[in-house]
Regions:
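Acidic-aromatic substrate-binding/catalytic surfaces of carbohydrate-active enzymes
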Residues: 57-124, 227, 240-284, 345-348, ...
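Polysaccharide-binding surfaces and accessory modules of carbohydrate-active proteins
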Residues: 158, 163-280, 328-330, 334-382
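Substrate-binding groove/exosite segments of carbohydrate-active enzymes
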Residues: 40-85, 282-300, 306, 313, ...
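Extended, loop-rich substrate-binding clefts of extracytoplasmic carbohydrate-active enzymes
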Residues: 112-176, 266-303
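Hydrophobic, small-residue-rich alpha-helical packing segments that form membrane-like cores
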Residues: 548-549, 553-588, 596-604
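Short, hydrophobic/aromatic-enriched beta-strand segments in well-ordered soluble domains
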Residues: 147, 158-160, 195-199, 313-325
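Carbohydrate-active enzyme catalytic cores, enriched for enzymes
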Residues: 582-588, 600-670
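Inter-helical turn/loop segments and adjacent helix faces that build the functional surface
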Residues: 184-185, 190, 497-508, 580-598
Length: 670
């Protein structure tokens, strides 16, 4: 199977999850639904909230704003929303033959309202000229920006990306952002052009007062005969410190100017001196020596590429921003076993520093670019409606953010979501990650690593599966009740991973724990060691104690509540797990179990229809504990209880009592 064929296969699999758009009640006409259309383009005030993540799998990212600005540096192993990096920008100088030169920051002009506690920060250079308008188009993994301004005599476009190559997490896990500036001379005369990238060394380390601050930051100019650019580090702090690491920004162009540090002055002098120098003739004074910054200060460095364009000529100027911050810390858990524990990023096994990353990226740039482009073209040149392509591609971008991480043992982990400065709801939450499909189809080896963690570490012999993972892994677990939808969904996901890979040996390795997790539904906790007695406290009774294929016990679920009684939310996942296990048991030679699961599945399928289908939709039957007084506003009229059997104050005992006078109704439509 060719690379293109593989991408088409995975594309179809991923897009299959979007088929729901075409089902149900018809809200749009068919011609509108099936209209391919073009990818959305954003301009004007719509650019304000665009944040396009660029980074590798589990490496962190930078975000490119809709105006062309670098919005955030999220490269230090946690989110960093809303913190625009100081003095970090691209700029252009152009001189058309016989005319006055023009210099601008390569961004659209700022968008009102100009809100900040003391106005727009000076380190974002709000007073420096920018382009009149921008058009941003997101075709993940590529972000495309077009800048327009009548004062600028060249056409300016940006293509920004990070390698995104399905089936290759190694090539898709590079801590880098690539900026290809495409400059075209549409005039009839020659033009001179300079493109510069400036960046403040952003590394903050612990000072003598144990506060994160600048100090002893070092910017080094390196020309290794292959690439030229700046490597940024700090000489303050220990090698194993969380802040320890480096950045680099480089180019393959030969004609460059460089400054390892801007003028060291007070107030606004550094930016003022730089802009006067740059805007004068498109060149800057070369400063290539290295000198540590003072305590409490850091330095801005610049790499400038200068060139000429004949009429009609176009040139691509590449810049590569790379980073290397290998040390992570568990800041998100309160459990003493893991709180503050340190571990390393997977990319630290492949690279030694940010310059090493840049060298690898550029040596392999053609292959990495073309393979990324193939995936992009298969997706965006397909006949799926544009809104489906937009939804699927934009969601895939989550894999290139701090939502996920890859530990140095190769295992993959993910939060439920992100706040502005931290991960939210750790880690590998089984019911939330039930919704996720992209990883399994595009990077299946990483998805399989998550199943291995779920079953080989987080599932006990009795089948009790904890639904959050504590990392680093160890002889400790998150001591909460098991999650019915997450546990059953996880079994279905093992089935999915087995089907996608065809690796029955992998399935055999997981099968004992998969079987235990399924049968936990009717066996429950059982006898456990003293150190696991908390399991009995978390779940008193099994989900399906009479083994009839219907869950009616306490079912913790993704709504962070408990269901009591039969329902098709957890019930459908239970049936799916049974059906999947019928086939998996057969594949591993466990035919007796295969037959047993099939009997339970068929019984449960009939029972759910019999109990919950009212002729129009499925309802939920809520088993109310004996003696519990149901609030008046939740009581139904007695005549509404005809399809409902609840354990209420006046109902007899048994699993499903007779209709109650105090009967709680909850309708769930599918």
């Amino acid at each position: 199977m060719s690379t293109r064929q593989r991408y088409i296969f995975f594309l179809c699999a991923v897009l299959a999850i979007s088929n729901f758009i075409f089902g149900g009640e018809q809200l749009y006409k068919k011609d509108k639904l099936y209209e391919t259309g073009k990818v959305r383009e954003f301009f004007g005030k719509d650019l304000r909230t665009i944040a396009f993540p660029i980074g590798g799998l589990g490496t962190g990212n930078i975000t490119l704003g809709g105006r062309g600005e670098i919005r955030e540096l999220e490269i230090f192993n946690r989110p960093n929303k809303g913190n625009y990096p100081d003095l970090t920008f691209f700029s252009i100088w152009v001189e058309e033959e016989g005319k006055k030169s023009v210099a601008k920051i390569l961004e659209r002009k700022l968008i009102s309202p100009y809100v900040a506690w003391m106005g727009i920060p000076r380190n974002q250079l709000p007073g420096v000229s920018r382009f009149e308008e921008a058009i941003f188009k997101g075709e993940y993994p590529f972000g495309y920006l077009t800048l327009t301004d009548n004062e600028v005599p060249v056409a300016v476009r940006l293509e920004a990306y990070n390698p995104f190559i399905p089936l290759s997490p190694e090539k898709s896990g590079i801590p880098a952002a690539v900026f290809n500036w495409k400059i075209k001379n549409d005039k009839k005369s020659k033009v001179k052009v300079s493109i510069a990238f400036s960046m403040l060394n952003p590394i903050k380390t612990l000072d003598k007062n144990k506060r994160h601050s600048y100090g002893k930051n070092l910017n080094q100019f390196i020309d290794d005969g292959f690439i030229k650019g700046i490597k940024m580090t700090s000489n303050r702090g220990e090698t194993e410190a969380l802040e320890s690491g480096s950045l680099a920004f480089v180019t393959t162009e030969k004609n460059i100017d460089v400054q390892t540090r801007w003028y060291r002055g007070g107030w606004w002098d550094n930016a003022h001196v730089f802009w006067d120098d740059f805007s004068d003739d498109g060149r800057i004074k070369n400063v290539s020596d290295s000198e540590e910054s003072m305590e409490g200060r850091s330095d801005v460095a610049t790499v400038l590429v200068h060139f000429e364009l004949d009429p009609g000529e176009e040139k691509v100027i590449p810049f590569y921003l790379t980073w290397y911050f290998p040390n992570r810390e568990n800041y998100w858990n309160r459990e003493k076993e893991v709180r503050g524990k340190k571990f390393k990023n997977y990319y630290s096994l492949k690279f030694q520093n940010a310059w090493d990353v840049a060298s690898y990226l550029i040596k392999n740039k053609e292959e990495l670019y073309q393979d990324t482009k193939v995936f992009h073209d298969v997706l965006f040149h397909s006949t799926y409606p544009s809104y489906v392509i937009d939804a699927v591609s934009s969601q895939a971008s989550s894999l290139k953010t701090n939502l996920v991480m890859r530990k140095d043992n190769g295992k993959f982990f993910g939060f439920e979501g992100l706040t502005d400065d931290s991960g939210c709801c750790p880690m590998n939450c089984t019911h939330v990650w039930n919704y996720e499909q992209t990883l399994a189809y595009l990077f299946p080896s990483l998805e399989r690593s998550m199943r291995e963690t779920d079953f080989l570490h987080n599932t006990f012999k009795n089948g009790y599966q904890v639904f959050r993972t504590l990392i680093p892994l160890g002889d400790y677990w998150w001591p909460f009740k098991p999650c019915a939808d997450g546990q059953m969904g996880n079994i279905v996901r093992v089935y999915r991973e087995w089907k996608l890979s065809g690796d029955t040996e992998w399935l055999k390795k997981l099968w004992p724990k998969v079987k235990a997790a399924l049968e936990f539904a009717w066996k429950g906790v059982g006898d456990v060691d003293k150190k696991l007695i908390w399991q009995k406290e978390r779940l008193l009774l099994p989900w399906d104690p009479d083994k009839d294929g219907v869950m009616e016990g306490e079912q913790h679920n993704t709504y962070d509540i408990e269901f009591y009684g039969p329902n098709t939310m957890t019930g459908s996942l239970y049936l799916a797990a049974l059906k999947a296990s019928v086939e998996m048991a057969e594949a591993v030679g466990d035919r007796k179990k295969s037959k047993e699961y099939l009997i339970i599945y068929e019984k449960g399928s009939k029972e759910y229809d019999s109990l919950l289908w009212n002729g129009e939709y499925y309802i939920q039957k809520v088993n109310v504990m004996e003696g519990l007084v149901v609030p008046e506003h939740l009581r139904s009229l007695e005549k509404d209880c005809e399809n409902l059997s609840c354990k209420g104050k006046d109902s007899p005992g048994g699993k499903m009592g007779a209709p109650s006078k105090a009967c709680l109704i909850q309708l769930v439509t599918l």
